[in-house]
Amino acid sequence: MAVHVENLSDLAKTNDGVAVSLNRYTDWKCRSGVSEAPLIPASMMSKITDYAKTTAKGNSVALNYTHVVLSLAPTIGVAIPGHVTVELINPNVEGPFQVMSGQTLSWSPGAGKPCLMIFSVHHQLNSDHEPFRVRITNTGIPTKKSYARCHAYWGFDVGTRHRYYKSEPARLIELEVGYQRTLLSSIKAVEAYVQFTFDTSRMEKNPQLCTKSNVNIIPPKAETGSIRGIAPPLSVVPNQGRESKVLKQKGGTGSKTTKLPSLEPSSGSSSGLSMSRRSHRNVLNSSIPIKRNQDGNWLGDHLSDKGRVTDPNPERL
């Protein structure tokens, strides 16, 4: 089983022949012309060389590359012509064979969509070889400034045993996250987003790729706010609640129409229009207390003493 080393200074101390798994992350800006960056910096290569010197005699140390993930986000306007070509380069080979077979992708920053490029390398190099490089070539983008931001994440292991893998063609996935915005600006975001690649390919069964337990975590979904709408009239809410209770007791489906209560005794001359006007007037005057007098009419406080006897002893009149 591979041993994961967090601190690069501890790499040379692991000299018992056990493979050491490493995960690397970096980011850079893509400018006009050709942008080329090594996957392993020179400072780390010196650590690997020291590790190779401390191993048992007769065993050659190998760099077993596993996967390379690039996240590209545009920094130019929409509908700008041109495209970029991303290639995985092996600088230890001369001529056109430097470009690894099947590890070339094309992307248009002017489309306004960030992209995710997954290179399934499964290749190995000796410790004294130059590391792989990522080459991004600008073709037809009319700008002198940077046109994209690249975030790279890759994994490899250092060990005394050589393993042979079969490389898979590179894949490009467009991200629907908005223009000039990418969710892969940190190593944790990259690990979370590429989890489906481990589920849909044989990369999941490779122990060298599963050095961390949080690799196969599904990205959390964005929380949406509560849905707001127009509330029903206050006079309807209590009746709906009572009717729903009655329907539940009777086993109804709740499809009956809720009728508004009549605000005054119905007569033959009253119409639905007059009732709606009266209900609208009562809603507007809801701030005035309403009570019923002796005649059964709706009156306010300013009219409650008119048209009736207020003296408790009517015999005096």
Curated annotation (Swiss-Prot):
What's the entry's take on its domains?
A: The C-terminal domain is essential for localization to cortical punctate structures at an early stage of infection.
Region annotation (Disordered) maps to: 223-317
* Cysteine disulfide links: none
* Quaternary state and interactors: Interacts with host glyceraldehyde 3-phosphate dehydrogenase-A/NbGAPDH-A; this interaction plays a positive role in cell-to-cell movement of the virus.
Where in or outside the cell? Host cell wall; Host endoplasmic reticulum membrane
Q: GO biological process: any one?
A: symbiont-mediated suppression of host innate immune response
Question: Bias category Low complexity: which stretches?
Answer: 255-276
**Keyword Magnesium in record:** no
- Lineage: superkingdom: Viruses
Descriptive protein name: Movement protein
Q: Which Gene Ontology terms of cellular component type are present?
A: host cell endoplasmic reticulum membrane; host cell wall; membrane
Basic and acidic residues: compositionally biased ranges: 302-317
**Source species, please?**
Red clover necrotic mosaic virus (RCNMV)
Q: Which InterPro entries match?
A: MPV
Q: Which Pfam families match?
A: 3A (PF00803)
Q: What does this protein do?
A: Plays an essential role in cell-to-cell movement and long-distance transport of the viral genome. Mechanistically, movement protein is recruited by viral replicase complexes formed on RNA1 to punctate structures on the host cortical endoplasmic reticulum. In turn, interacts with the viral genome and mediates virion movement from cell to cell. Also acts as a suppressor of RNA-mediated gene silencing, also known as post-transcriptional gene silencing (PTGS), a mechanism of plant viral defense that limits the accumulation of viral RNAs.
Q: Which residues form a coiled coil?
A: none
Question: Which keywords has UniProt assigned to this entry?
Answer: Host endoplasmic reticulum, Host membrane, Host-virus interaction, Inhibition of host innate immune response by virus, Membrane, Suppressor of RNA silencing, Transport, Viral immunoevasion, Viral movement protein
